[in-house]
Amino acid sequence: TTDRRWIHYINADGTRGKMRQFDHLPQGAKYQLFDDIRYTNHVGIDFYHRYKEDIALFAELGFTTFNTTISWARIYPHGVEGGVNQEGVEFYRNVFKECRKYGIDPVITLYKYDEPVYLEETYGDWTNREMIHQFVEFARVCFTEYKDLVDKWLTFNEINILLHFDVKEGKQFAFEELHNQMVAAAKAVKVAHEIDKNISVGCMIAGFCSYPYTCDPKDVIANYKEFQNKFAYCADTMVRGYYPSYAKRIWKENNVTLNISEEDKKDLMEGKSDFLAYSYYMSNVVTTHKDEGEALGGAGTSANLKNPYLTASDWGWQIDPTGYEYFLHVLNDRYQVPIFDVENGLGAYDKVEEDGSIH
C-alpha cells in the first residue's frame, strides 16, 4: 500500500478501524478496499477490544437484538484459495457467545461494501462471476461455524444502493455487479438451508419512501416508477425469486443489457429470501415539474425540493415518522414475508454534559 491508502477493517459492530501498518491488523485479517475519503483516521469505539463491556452496556439498555457485520477479510484474507483464518472465526464466535450470554439475538450481515483487497487484486470487481463463488464459500463457512449461535442472517447490506447514485463506471457496470450479487445472495440462501433448515436468510434493501410532490397524475406515476427503480427492483427479485416485468423498462432506460442464464434464473427462484430487511431514515418527494426544483432526469427525487409538512435534521434529512408507518404498510402488502427494520436513526449535534449525559 502507499501513503494515499489507509488499511481499513470493519469492527464487529460495523464501525471501521483504520491504520497504516499491516502488522497492526487484528486477528491476521488483510486490509479491506476503501479509498482514503474519510475525514479522520480515528478509531470509532474500538469494539474489537471492548466488545464484552459494550455488549454488557447494550444488554443494560434492554436491547434483545444486535445487528453487526462479519468482516469477509477476517475470515478469508486471501480468498478461498488462501484458506480460513481460524483466529477470525474464533473472534466472532466469542462475540456471538457474549450476545447469547445476555439473551441477545444476533442478526448478522455478511457483506457491507467490503471485500478483501486480495479478491480485488486477483479477480477485479463484482462483474467477475468468480466473486459469486468466493462469496458463497465465505457464507458457507459462516453458516457452518455459527449455526449454533446465529439463526438470522443478511446477505448484502443495502444491495440496491448502486441504483441510488451514478457510478463512474456507468450503469452497465452497476447493473452487472448488482445481478451477480443477487445471484450470490440466492446461492447463499440455498447453502444455508442445506446446512440447517432452521437458518433464516434475508435480503437488506435501502429504504426508499417517497411521495408525489403534487397531485399531478404525472407526478404520481413518476413517484411509483422511482419506487420500482430504487427499491422494488431488488426486493421483488430477491423475495419473489425472479426479475419483475418492469425490469425491462429499467434496463431500456439505462441502456443496459444483462446476460441472465437459465442457471441464474433457477438460483434466484430456489434461493428466495426468507425475510425482507430494510433501512429507513427519511422520506423524499418526486416531481416531473422542473420549475419546482431540480428533478433528476425529468422525474425523480429532487435535491432542492423539501416536503413542506416535515421538519429536517441538521443535515437536511426530513424527519417523517408517519412515513415509517406508511412504508411498513407498503412492504407488508407487497411481500407478505417477515419484515425487519435493521437501520433507523437521526443525526444530531450532541453535547456531552459534565455528568456524562448526552443531549
Annotated model-derived regions:
Residues T1-D35, H78-V80, V89-I358:
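Active-site region of glycoside hydrolase catalytic domains
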Residues D36-R50, D125-E130:
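Active-site mouth loops of central-metabolism enzymes
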Residues D46, R50-S71, E270-L276:
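Catalytic domains of carbohydrate-active enzymes, especially glycoside hydrolases
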Residues L61-G88, I108:
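Aromatic-lined carbohydrate-binding/catalytic grooves of carbohydrate-active enzymes
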